[in-house]
Design a protein with these regions (language model features):
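Extended substrate-binding grooves/exosites of carbohydrate-active enzymes
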Residues: 1-178
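Short flexible loop/turn segments that cap and initiate beta-strands
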Residues: 111, 117-129, 181-183, 209, ...
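Short, solvent-exposed loop/linker segments at the N-terminal edge
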Residues: 96-101, 201-210
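Beta-strand-rich structural segments
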Residues: 106-110, 170-171, 196, 207-225, ...
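Low-complexity "stalk/linker" and mucin-like segments enriched in Ser/Thr/Pro/Ala/Gly
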Residues: 135-147, 238-264
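Edge beta-strands of extracellular beta-sandwich domains
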Residues: 176-188, 290-299
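Extracellular Ig-like/FN3 beta-sandwich strand-entry sites
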Residues: 162-166, 209, 277-279
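Short, hydrophobic beta-strand segments
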Residues: 150, 155-162, 254-275
């Protein structure tokens, strides 16, 4: 709805396939040397499948969105591509006012084989990746309808019902040992702005950039995933506001203007240095929210 695609990531384009199809082919076919994904990073243009639906104007199938923020599918790829980094990611978010008691599936992307899901302390059971799935036994229409290939790489609880509170997952290794856990909570009302720079020290060359992740969080620091507040930015000192993006493929807001609405509670603000070294102060404000200030150092 709203010219967006679901975070469950079950939609594929006509000239492509689901990530799991390629994963499994690479594993089974020794003549395949690698994998090509279009695209890693969303870009302006080709708003598949909303080609003619205004105001859609950027791609939706990237692993990372237009603001440089990883999508849920990023963690699916990482769980398979990079076994050296622990991945334990829960989706979707858990703010679904009006869906109380309705079936709301929960997916977990992880590099571990098994996980157990809890909603408000009640176990929803364990799921284990189905290693029996092959390219040849999972391509028929019934297997596709039952998401058979997905069960090889995703842990899916398809019958969970939404209730506000805490979603928790415990991951287990191949020997059955609990090795990791993660929680996600229903966020309260938007309370403050949170700023996090990818680098707090940049070069004073008039070109270097600091990419700042902007979040709207509640009093307890939980991301507010449905927030759409407009943030206004001011930069003081030896730098200036370069651009911003929120990852919304339907947003027509200017990238250069020092104000923008967050999308799903987040956006990215970009601060540039000047050729004069010193402190750069980024201030973010929004009506009804506690403001945030971030200091970045620039030097030669």
């Amino acid at each position: 709805s709203g010219f967006q695609l679901s975070s469950y990531d079950m939609t594929t384009i006509g000239w492509g396939c689901a990530p799991e199809v390629q994963f499994k082919m690479n594993e089974e076919y020794s003549f395949m040397s690698g994998e090509f994904v279009w695209t890693g990073f969303d870009y302006l243009g080709e708003p598949t499948p909303y080609y003619s639906d205004w105001p859609s104007h950027s791609s939706l199938f990237g692993i990372i969105d237009l603001a440089g923020i990883p999508k849920d599918r990023y963690y699916l790829y990482r769980s398979h591509w990079n076994k050296d980094v622990e991945t334990l990611h829960i989706l979707p978010h858990w703010n679904w006012e009006g869906r109380e008691g309705e079936v709301t599936p929960v997916f977990v992307y992880t590099n571990y084989p098994t996980a157990e899901l809890f909603i408000n302390g009640k176990s929803q059971g364990k799921r284990t990746k189905d290693l029996s799935v092959t390219v040849h036994n999972s391509g028929d229409s019934l297997s596709t309808a039952n998401f058979k290939r997905q069960k090889r790489y995703r842990l899916m609880w398809m019958d969970t019902k939404y209730e506000p509170g805490t979603v928790k997952v415990i991951a287990y290794d191949k020997d059955g040992n609990a090795v990791a856990e993660k929680e996600m909570k229903t966020a309260g009302k938007p309370y403050r702005i949170e700023l996090t720079a990818d680098r707090d020290k940049i070069m004073a060359d008039g070109k270097d950039l600091s990419f700042v992740t902007v979040k709207i969080v509640d009093k307890d620091g939980n991301l507010c995933p449905t927030a759409a507040n407009e943030i206004t930015f001011k930069v003081k000192g030896k730098g200036y506001y370069r651009a911003g993006a929120n990852g919304d493929p339907t947003s027509l807001e200017s990238f250069q203007a020092p104000h923008m609405k967050v999308f799903s509670g987040m956006m990215t603000a970009i601060v540039s240095s000047t050729e004069e070294p010193g402190k750069i102060t980024l201030e973010a404000t929004s009506k009804g929210l506690k403001k945030a200030t971030l200091v970045i150092e620039s030097g030669k």
